[in-house]
UniProtKB/Swiss-Prot annotation:
The gene is fabH. GO terms for biological process: fatty acid biosynthetic process; secondary metabolite biosynthetic process. One of its GO terms (cellular component) is cytoplasm. Pathway: Lipid metabolism; fatty acid biosynthesis. This is Beta-ketoacyl-[acyl-carrier-protein] synthase III. The last Arg residue of the ACP-binding site is essential for the weak association between ACP/AcpP and FabH. The active site is at 119, 252, 282. It comes from Albidiferax ferrireducens (strain ATCC BAA-621 / DSM 15236 / T118). GO terms for molecular function: 3-oxoacyl-[acyl-carrier-protein] synthase activity; beta-ketoacyl-acyl-carrier-protein synthase III activity. Its main location: cytoplasm. Pfam families: ACP_syn_III, ACP_syn_III_C. Its EC number is 2.3.1.180.
Amino acid sequence: MKLYSRITGTGSYLPPRRLTNSDLAAELATQGVETSDDWIVERTGIRARHFAAPEVCSSDLGLEAARRALQAAGAKAQDIDLIIVATSTPDMVFPSTACILQDKLGANGCPAFDVQAVCSGFIYALSIADAMIKTGAAKKALVIGAEVFSRILDFKDRTTCVLFGDGAGAVVLEASDTPGILASDLHADGKHVGILCVPGHVSGGNVLGAPLLQMDGPAVFKLAVGVLDEAARAVLAKAGKTAADIDWLIPHQANIRIMQSSARKLKLSMDKVVVTVDQHGNTSAASIPLALDAAVRSGKVKAGELLLLEGVGGGFTWGAVLLNL
């Protein structure tokens, strides 16, 4: 019998501290950095973001999202036989955030590892879990995107510090005899490393080089809109579908302009696009599962619908997954 994988539960978590654009602008003003709600909304569509407390790590946020996904799936931690965490802000250099989260969750013993593909991380992680389930290597996987990007922001750079927030999203992906994930498409091009990066590295116990996020916004936008369309069309072709078949586009929640461009290229109304970036900003690898969970819990996205998930991030990395919920 051919094996497939299906999402059976979703979950998400945002830390309690919420900063509106006006809140953030007031804090930045004390450091001599000027911005405003109008400036941020016009360029990004972001109205608020959440920042984790200093003692809270990616594994803590991921743990809460994982628990909610397990509850939604009617599963227990002990049922999980694979944990993949997508993060660019790990708790430690090593061991992996997945191992740390595994112990907190009480799912010890199964394979657990991190995937680092920045904002494409959840797409990469979901695709890996799907492949492992299809080969019989796992039956019930926990796939998590978790980030504390507030730790790596340069709050003197108004072009980047207003964009990002902290959060986590998770799904339970289970073996099924009916297709859930229909196709995936993953890519990377390392020649674009410099347009979105944190160039510091650990050596001899010290962080060497610049430890904070750097981004060439116009270059990222130009590249993103092209590669996202390529990935979207690739998964549709692999699954024998067309853009007209899509019920919902759930893109990486980076910038409303990129999402509008993606929808326009696919000839989709924005009414078919799940948008949550206004509420939590760019949460990197957490953004797609956050948006998916919000849409499922609100009743907007329903079982049986065709979803196109797409992400793009530093590396440069990008990809898409087409699935029936």
